[in-house]
């Protein structure tokens, strides 16, 4: 079975919709096939994809993190011939599968008279734009997409949170824009300038945004993300209670070709707190070396002369 032989893009087999489709293709016997059919259709409907299976399957491939997408996201212009052959074969299979209609599957199914069952049917729709056209052009389009947008979940999402020892995407991030914020323009501009320097590969600093509640500290970070994510900026919120996990977090992003702000909100600077000791260790390099693709932005409304 071709889908089982995916190599570079085999990561899509772990995703919900492709996995359900794979089980349908492998189903043997009438009962197993009908169960797999019903499950696949339900999965599509739950995600609002009942009319666009091709877009879903090819989109899953577009956002897959693999040897090709990582290399392209890192700026590679040339790739090993063997890798390109693997990519070409995988994309050909994915495009063929995305074009299969319910009628195609029923024709090769173990069901004797499928028309009498009136099974629910989905629409195929069209592949994502990057996978429309000649296959070699599609590979070039995919590579360009990765160079411009990154790969994996970092291409699909802009905001993340550290939870359960892993980086998890935020599907619906705060939509605040810089133009929405009023007051403290000088201080905000300093944070903006520092962030722009970071994105341009120039020297930049970790930032502590401090002041009374309601002065726009957290909103500034969220607004900068919405302003600059097309330029490769991503934000990972790290709960202050998880600061001891900092080495684990930076290990997971060190090789990702994006720029990350590690955002720590509402810090307390009492020397008796664990967060104070943990942040001090992070900033002084006691826990892990912070990779060049990351900065720490923290906010606090508790700061005195002794901490400046």
Regions found by a protein language model. Name each.
Residues 202-204, 231-232, 256-258, 290-293:
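Short loop/turn elements that form and flank the Walker-type P-loop nucleotide-binding site
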Residues 265-267:
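Walker B catalytic acidic pair
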Residues 251-255, 270-307:
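Conserved catalytic/switch belt of AAA+ P-loop NTPases
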Residues 206-236, 240, 249-254:
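Walker A/P-loop
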Residues 1-182, 186:
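AAA+ P-loop ATPase mechanoenzymes
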Residues 193-204, 226-230, 252, 281, ...:
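Conserved helix-loop functional segments at active or binding sites
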Residues 173-208:
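Pre-Walker A (pre-P-loop) alpha-helix and adjacent loop at the N terminus of AAA/AAA+ ATPase modules
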């Amino acid at each position: 079975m071709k889908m089982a032989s995916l190599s570079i893009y085999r990561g899509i087999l772990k995703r919900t919709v492709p996995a359900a489709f794979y089980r349908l293709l492998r189903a043997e016997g009438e009962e197993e096939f009908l169960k797999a059919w019903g499950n696949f259709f339900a999965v599509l409907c739950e995600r609002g994809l009942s009319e666009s299976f091709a877009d879903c399957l090819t989109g899953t491939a577009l956002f897959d993190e693999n040897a090709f997408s990582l290399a392209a996201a890192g700026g590679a212009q040339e790739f090993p011939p063997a890798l390109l052959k693997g990519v070409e074969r995988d994309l050909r299979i994915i495009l063929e599968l995305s074009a299969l209609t319910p009628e195609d599957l029923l024709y090769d199914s173990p069901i004797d008279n499928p028309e009498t069952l009136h099974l629910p049917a989905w629409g195929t729709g069209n592949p994502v734009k990057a996978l429309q056209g000649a296959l070699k052009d599609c590979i070039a389009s995919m590579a360009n997409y990765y160079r411009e947008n990154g790969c994996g979940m970092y291409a699909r999402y802009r905001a993340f949170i550290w939870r359960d020892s892993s980086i998890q995407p935020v599907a619906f991030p705060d939509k605040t824009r810089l133009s929405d914020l009023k007051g403290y323009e000088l201080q905000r501009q300093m944070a903006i300038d520092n962030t722009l320097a970071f994105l341009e590969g120039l020297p930049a600093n970790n930032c502590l945004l401090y002041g009374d509640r309601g002065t726009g500290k957290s909103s500034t970070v969220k607004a900068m993300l919405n302003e600059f994510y097309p330029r490769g900026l991503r934000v990972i919120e790290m709960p202050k209670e998880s600061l001891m996990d900092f080495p684990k977090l930076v290990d997971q992003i060190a090789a990702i070709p994006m720029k990350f702000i590690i955002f720590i909100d509402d810090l307390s600077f009492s020397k008796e707190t664990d967060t104070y000791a943990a942040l001090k260790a992070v900033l002084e390099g006691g826990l892990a070396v912070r990779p060049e693709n990351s900065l720490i932005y923290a906010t606090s409304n508790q700061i005195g002369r002794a901490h400046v």
